[in-house]
Amino acid sequence: MRNARSAGHTGGMSENGSGVVLAVSLDGSHRFSKVPVEEIRLREGWGVDGDAHAGVTVQHRSRVARDPTQPNLRQVHLVHAELFDEVDAAGYAVAPGELGENVTTRGIDLLGLPTGTVLHLGESAAVEVTGLRNPCAQINGFEQGLLGELVGRDADGDVVRKAGVMAVVLAGGAVRPGDGIRVELPSGERLPLRPV
């Protein structure tokens, strides 16, 4: 398995440096899509206040069914808006929050970041990237055929997952559309993202 960056899909985005928050979304229920809002509040070690996926232990239903004591590595879901541009060209109209993400970004190659990258959002919030979102069949329930655009294979036959990244909250704070994002790459060995 290779991530999108190793498959050559940087799309002109920055893999270190900076980007911007395009939208923020949350939902207190376990629905596929989230509702765009003016602001979300991140809480250290917890996630997005008021979001169904916030918590110290796993909150995603499939993971709770397997082992409810697992640490929650999916407190915050981030998707790059460049993905919306890509699927729009294939005939799928997707708006911020509709893929279930809490933070929609622009200008950062999220999929090309190594595990452990810290994203500084706005004035004080920070999240650590834990891995790739593993797209599931619910995506086709949202829009038939979209899953095929979010999971594919590269020229070497390796699986490419494009549905964003998951993170845990290191430092709390408010995050709003228009906030800057600063990328802090991990020191030492840089491990590629894997599904979490």
Give residue spans per PLM region.
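Metal-cofactor-dependent catalytic cores
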Residues: 2-196
